Amino acid sequence: ASSPIEGDRTDNRNLIEEWQAIYPEGVYIDRQQQFDGLDKTSGAPVFALFNESHMLYEADRGNDIGGEPSLSEMTEVTLDILDNNPKGYFLLVESGRIDHGHHANSAFNALTDTIEFSRAIQTAVDNSNPDNTLIIVTADHGHVFTIAGYPKRGNPILGKVVDVGTSELAKGLDGLPYTTLSYANGPGFHDFGNETNADKVYYTKPFMGRADLTHIDTRSSGFHQEAMIAKRSESHSGEDVAVYATGPGAHLVSGTQEQS
């Protein structure tokens, strides 16, 4: 079964109403203004849904008409609420749009959301007691995302490769410049200018082959990196992922986690 509305159910159940019936004292919110006005000390359950489907990319968040809090904002408010529980708490925070940015071959969006994820981690560190709070940071998989060439120090990470000792663009054997960042597969090169929603790439055909990037601004939000193999969507990779931890028991967590 399918529905023309994203996130709509086809069995006629309204889970929001069901939740409100179970928790009549609970607070349901779906926009920034309600989020900002939350009473974090009431102890009432909170159910927050800010989008029909996925949250927006961090770079695209300002285009949400109803307003959408950032990952770090949600982390801070959630910790304030959970901290009222004398028995402690478990909180899982996921920055899922990093994954989606990579699938779209949009390093700009993937890295912008990674920066916001870093802010959320720092928010968790700043708003918890290190003596009794274990914080673990990891990933569930990697992506076929590479750093290529030998760009000189200071070269923009989203830019085209300029080799050490020169001011000229480095070029492949095909005579075309290339970016520091690229993907093994995916929809490949697209230039959408200042577009901040990486998912726009799925409304076009995957790009085949190389593109002449000489006069393309590869640092713009709407630039999608080249891919060696054209696919509708970039794939996950197979390398182990890093695991970081701080707090009680952190000494038991180190190194990498094997992907399954």
Task: Please report, for each region that a protein language model flagged, where it lies by residue.
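A post-motif C-terminal structural segment
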Residues: A1-S260
